[in-house]
Each structure stands twice: as C-alpha cells, then as structure tokens.
A protein has these predicted regions:
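Conserved catalytic core of the tyrosine transesterase superfamily
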Residues: 1-263
Length: 263
C-alpha cells in the first residue's frame, strides 16, 4: 500500500489508514480504492468549508479543489455530526445534481469509513453515519417486462427451491444484474442494504438493495443449505455447489412459461 500512501498524501492519515485497510485486509480492487479516495476527499473538503462558514451557493468545484485537508486532525472528524452529512447529501443533490445511485455509493463510502474509525481504529466513540440513510432509488425493471408482468413472474415461483428462485428473480428485476454477476455473488458481498458485485474486468460496483431485495435475501438465507461444498456462494445448487449460469437460465425460462410469457 506504500504507493497508495504516496499517491493519496493529500488526504488525512485516517483516510489513508482506511484505504490501506480496504486494500490490504478487505482486498478491494484498485478502482474501488480510488473511488473511496475521491469520495472521501471531496466529502471532507466540503465539510471543512461547511464548518468554516461557507454556504452551499458559494462552494464550487474550484473552491473544493483548492481546499487542503491533508493536516485535518481527529478532533475535526469528531466534530462531524449527522446533520453535517445530511447537508452534504443535500449539496450533492441540489448543487451537483448527483443521481440517486451516485449518492447511494457515496453514502456507502462514508458509512464504511466512519464504521472503520469507530470499530477498527477505535478513535471515535460516536459514529455520525450510523443513522445516515441511503437515498431512495427507483425500482429498476428490465425494459422488456411491465410491472404487471414482473409481478406475475414472481407469483409463478414455487417448488423445492422457491425461496432461492424468488430471491434470484427479485435481484434480477430490481438490480439490473448480469447473469455472471448474479451467480458469482458471495455471502460477504452483502452488507446491509449494499451489494458488491464483480463485473467485467473484475471491476467492483456497489448496488443498493431495496426492501424487496432485502426481504427476499433474508427469506432465502433462512433456508439456504448449511452443509455445502462452496460455503461462500450465496446461491446454491441442489448438488451443494455454486449455482451455474445454465441452471439459472433454465429456471428463468421455466417461470416465464408458467407465467404465460413468450420465452
């Protein structure tokens, strides 16, 4: 991580420590580490300006870039409250016009960072982001299915693997996952309402899990086989191994037929 410390020396040591932890311990990809870096650097530059008395209307990209936070100490970080984070999210929405998905990613980064300082570094007694909510995202449905068709498809699920299949279809309908991304989901990729998926080129991305997804995952995990060959895999086949792409394809086609759609 030495290269990262040098490359990221314009952020406080606590952010550098976090980047080290996420890279060396959590094994996050280089692109994900850079996203954490940019998200946190921007957030703390904004927070410094906010606490210096600047109004949102006066904070622009040029001012953000000029703001030095490299020597920011733990006392400043301890002074951050939930209200400050709410103001930051409002700035992202109203001034920068960030999309809900972008704001959701930045919330996930902030929550991970403050959780690290609270439970790993143990330099914070109170986590200001513990009650920070993820922006509500619109439900994402495949373009070729209407809402009624989607509901009909979900209602067609039954059988021995009902909870598993319902969870798979719910994630497909709400999260816009590729087939390869879905079958490669591991148990540890799910953190509360955030799902980390590995896409093309081993690129990681974070996806917000709405209530329907969270309920489906919880219901499936409650009945998921425990004595399996691949313990990390979320979706398990009847042989106790990670579910395969072909199995999912056949399953989806079956329920489309049951729901009286054309496959």
């Amino acid at each position: 991580m030495e290269g990262y410390i040098y490359m990221f020396d314009d952020v406080p040591i606590y952010i550098q420590n976090f980047l080290e932890y996420m890279s060396g311990i959590k094994n996050r990809s280089n692109s994900t580490i850079k996203e954490y870096y940019y998200d946190l650097r921007y957030a703390f530059r904004y927070l410094k300006l906010l606490k210096s008395g600047y109004k949102d209307s006066k904070i622009d990209s040029e001012l953000i870039e000029k703001t030095d936070i490299s020597n920011m100490d733990i006392q400043f970080i301890k002074s951050i409250e939930l209200e400050d984070l709410h103001k930051y999210l409002n700035y992202l929405s109203k001034i920068l016009s960030d999309k809900p998905t972008t704001r959701a990613r930045k919330v996930a980064t902030l929550k991970s960072f403050f959780n690290f300082l609270t439970h790993k570094k143990k330099v914070l007694e109170k986590n200001p982001a513990v009650e920070l909510e993820t922006p509500k995202l619109p439900k994402r449905l495949p373009k070729y299915l209407s809402l009624d068709e989607s509901l009909s498809l979900l209602h067609s699920v039954d059988g021995e693997f009902e909870k598993r299949d319902l969870c798979i279809l719910t994630l497909f309908l709400n999260c816009g996952l590729r087939l390869s991304e879905l079958v490669n989901i591991n148990m540890y990729h799910i953190r509360g309402d955030i799902l980390t998926v590995i896409g093309k080129g081993d690129k990681e991305r974070s996806i917000y899990l709405n209530d329907a997804c969270q309920k489906a995952i919880k219901a499936y995990i409650a009945v998921r086989p425990k004595d399996v060959k691949e313990r990390d895999a979320l979706f398990i086949s009847k042989r106790g191994t990670r579910i395969g792409k072909r199995t999912v394809e056949v399953m989806v086609k079956k329920y489309i037929i049951v729901a009286r759609f054309r496959p």
